[in-house]
Amino acid sequence: MNNEICEITCIHEDKVNRAKSKLANFDTPSVSGFFKILSDENRLKIVHALVHEDELCVCDIANIIDASVATTSHHLNSLKKLGVVDSHKDGKLVYYFIKNIKILNLMELGVNFKEEVLA
């Protein structure tokens, strides 16, 4: 016998309707897209590096994540569209920095979750 699933089908309509009502007001595609972009290891490495270094040029970031400048630029563009990072040009160099420091809270939450729950 599988203890992970119900042995009979029993729908609790009041609970289901409340959950569906709340879900209707929840922007699932945007939140899912946000986590999808952050689910890439290289993007997490980029965010982690920028949290600790304030700003880095694309060449430095490429070296840190051991990727080409083109691949790194693609990752940075995704993070920029998401509003996590921003950039400024200084001569011939483009520097990236964390735009919204709340991303640090999210990363800390992820680390704490892993340590407490997944350990």
UniProtKB/Swiss-Prot annotation:
DNA-binding stretch(es), residue numbering of this chain: 58-77
Transmembrane segments: none
A single MF term (Gene Ontology): DNA-binding transcription factor activity
Pfam family, one: HTH_5
Binding site for Cd(2+): C6, C10, C57, C59
GO biological process terms on file: response to cadmium ion
Residue ranges annotated for the HTH arsR-type domain, each copy included: 23-118
PANTHER family xrefs: ARSENICAL RESISTANCE OPERON REPRESSOR ARSR-RELATED, HTH-TYPE TRANSCRIPTIONAL REPRESSOR CZRA
Assembly mode: Homodimer.
Name listed for the protein in its UniProt record: Cadmium resistance transcriptional regulatory protein CadC
UniProt organism field: Listeria innocua serovar 6a (strain ATCC BAA-680 / CLIP 11262)
Highest classification ranks of the organism: Bacteria, Bacillati, Bacillota, Bacilli, Bacillales
Encoding gene (name): cadC
